[in-house]
Amino acid sequence: MADSKTKKKCSFCGRSENEVGFLITGMNGYICDSCATQAYEITQEALGEGRKRAGATKLNLKELPKPVEIKKFLDQYVIGQDDAKRFLSVSVYNHYKRLLQKDSGDDVEIEKSNIIMVGSTGTGKTLLARTIAKLLHVPFTIVDATVLTEAGYVGEDIESILTRLLQVADYNVPEAEQGIVFIDEIDKIARKGDNPSITRDVSGEGVQQGLLKLLEGSVVNVPPQGGRKHPDQKMIPVNTKNILFICGGAFDGIEKKIAQRLNTHVVGYTASQKTAVIDKNNMMQYIAPQDLKSFGLIPEIIGRLPVLTYLNPLDRNALRAILTEPKNSIIKQYIKLFEMDGIKLTFEDSVFEYIVDKAVEYKLGARGLRSIVETIMMDVMFEIPSESKKEYKVTLDYAKQQLEKANMARLQIA
């Protein structure tokens, strides 16, 4: 009996029963615990590669939302900004039509139209991009341009943008190659003037140069887990040709560049007529590519962001609407949170007016509305889940009391 045991060995590695943890018996052989684990890992890796090769969700022109439908969807989540919505709706529709062109065998090749949105903080740039990705069910990621640096310097490599997109797409490469990347604060990587720099600018002009290959469409080797590249790391090739890049920035001070350009054009040429139609309270609507160049974006990157649109500054009426009207408005979110605890939350109308007044006073934009509401609601959200109340009404006096005891300086930089 002992002799028969010694003859048992793993059919894969050849080790005997005494040399392994245990043997699993099959119909015509054995496998040890070590080989079983290794076989499982190989199987999982092969299945993962198969999923990647399976490809992305097949686009269908009939199912692709038309520009009017895209705008209607945006209207449900974003208040105002009709011009920006129309630009985005048309550009996104044409971009995904372009992806279908490769199956048609047409001789006319449609070029990619990446987008740049200019507007003050809190006007809805990020929300617009996120909402479009939600409608189209494509991978979407947001990248802060301020953390990007040239390769070899402290900070994140340009390729880390694609690493994030891959992670969102669960490493399905074809799916990621149809995704949307929103690069926020693109204005922060502007060079310090209109002229090329003679010194090294690793987080400004250098990053712009690095972004060129991503924006124009090329195959980029991406580290799967992000971070710096090293020789032993397996790279994933990603083709950026069909990735839609949307860039956004506040471009603080660009109004002066626009005004200078308009004044230059006006002098000596029907000056009185042109000056009369210029809205000095909203200079962004007159923005042109040469203004971006004057601000510090290099001509090459401007050329790869051919769709330029602007977002209007939010007035008091727009902020009031943003607070309560969209499908996922801030107030509706808090009502839902309380509803999950079995509590009916209501507000006095004067509370909404007060919140908007403070957002205007501190120039916080739409993003600041949440900070103000959060400050007002913090104490009640802490206490009321432990109480037996079924209803709670936020009064103007309570809202004022909460904001007065809060650190308003913190809200001002929200």
UniProtKB/Swiss-Prot annotation:
ATP binds at S120, T121, G122, T123, G124, K125, T126, L127. One of its GO terms (molecular function) is unfolded protein binding. Zn(2+) binds at C10, C13, C32, C35. Keywords: ATP-binding, Chaperone, Metal-binding, Nucleotide-binding, Zinc. Signal peptide: none annotated. GO terms for cellular component: HslUV protease complex. InterPro entries: AAA+_ATPase, ATP-dep_Clp_protease_ClpX, ATPase_AAA_core, Clp_ATPase_C, Clp_protease_ATP-bd_su_ClpX, ClpX_bact, P-loop_NTPase, Znf_CppX_C4. Residues 1-51 form the ClpX-type ZB domain. One of its GO terms (biological process) is proteolysis involved in protein catabolic process. Belongs to the ClpX chaperone family. ATP-dependent specificity component of the Clp protease. It directs the protease to specific substrates. Can perform chaperone functions in the absence of ClpP. HAMAP family: ClpX. Component of the ClpX-ClpP complex. Forms a hexameric ring that, in the presence of ATP, binds to fourteen ClpP subunits assembled into a disk-like structure with a central cavity, resembling the structure of eukaryotic proteasomes. NCBIfam families: clpX, PRK05342.1. This is ATP-dependent Clp protease ATP-binding subunit ClpX. It comes from Bacteroides thetaiotaomicron (strain ATCC 29148 / DSM 2079 / JCM 5827 / CCUG 10774 / NCTC 10582 / VPI-5482 / E50).
